[in-house]
């Protein structure tokens, strides 16, 4: 991945994290890599564990970043979340949800989609 693209992605993830922290969520871990998938942000929202996918698109002509979280991507995220929970058994009993932060435009405008999909939808 080109350096400029990596830098843009890191900046958008940092902005997404700041948005969620302003809303009261707390970071558990960022950029957790597991076989077959990466979790951009894992956060706590009260007693819930939130797996956050951050997607950036320069423009939203084709549905923006959220539209790119198709069934294949959702399945990878669910698998990564299962592996995360297996590695962190103390968190495994918490209710979980999957959120998406969609970013588009220059400068990026963020939209937080709470409970964007469920594990059993995949």
UniProtKB/Swiss-Prot annotation:
Gene3D superfamilies: 3.40.1350.10. One of its GO terms (molecular function) is nucleic acid binding. It comes from Xanthomonas oryzae pv. oryzae (strain KACC10331 / KXO85). It comes from the Bacteria. HAMAP family: UPF0102 (MF_00048). This is UPF0102 protein XOO3839. InterPro entries: Restrct_endonuc-II-like (IPR011335), tRNA_endonuc-like_dom_sf (IPR011856), UPF0102_YraN-like (IPR003509). Pfam families: UPF0102. Belongs to the UPF0102 family. PANTHER family: UPF0102 PROTEIN YRAN (PTHR34039:SF1).
């Amino acid at each position: 991945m080109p350096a400029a693209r990596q830098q843009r992605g890191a900046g958008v993830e940092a902005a997404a994290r700041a948005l969620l922290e302003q809303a009261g969520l707390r970071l558990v871990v960022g950029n957790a890599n597991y076989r077959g998938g990466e979790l951009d942000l894992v956060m706590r929202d009260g007693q819930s564990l939130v797996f956050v996918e951050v997607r950036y698109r320069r423009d939203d002509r084709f549905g923006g970043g959220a539209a790119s979280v198709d069934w294949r991507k959702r399945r990878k995220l669910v698998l990564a979340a299962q592996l995360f929970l297996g590695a962190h058994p103390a968190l495994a009993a918490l209710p979980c949800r999957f959120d998406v932060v969609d970013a588009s435009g220059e400068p990026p405008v963020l939209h937080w989609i709470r409970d964007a999909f469920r594990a059993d939808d995949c």
